[in-house]
UniProtKB/Swiss-Prot annotation:
This is Large ribosomal subunit protein bL31B. Belongs to the bacterial ribosomal protein bL31 family. Type B subfamily. The gene is rpmE2. GO terms for molecular function: structural constituent of ribosome. Transmembrane segments: none annotated.
Length: 83
């Protein structure tokens, strides 16, 4: 392998799905200031909005994840209109 090709900061990171609270450990180069205790060790924490544990494609369930209130905003503008 060539030296200096791969990033130095490639390390284990905990990813936390904020829609359902599931966490998993993977390697990443992401920069984060937060840490969390996971399986007896302290790791950097990255909060994500959706993952394979909550995405409708992987779960087979049709759920609506609205983290920014966009659905409510849309429904208040266009949801009550009649043809």
């Amino acid at each position: 392998m060539k030296k200096g090709l791969h990033p130095e900061s490639y390390r284990p990171v905990v990813f936390k799905d904020m829609s359902n609270g599931d966490m998993f450990l993977s390697k990443s180069t992401v920069a984060t200031k937060e840490t969390i205790e996971f399986e007896g060790e302290t790791y950097p924490l990255l909060k994500i909005e959706i993952s394979n544990t909550s995405h409708p494609f992987y779960t087979g369930k049709s759920t609506l994840v609205d983290t920014a209130g966009r659905v409510d905003k849309f429904m208040s503008r266009y949801g009550n209109r009649k043809k």
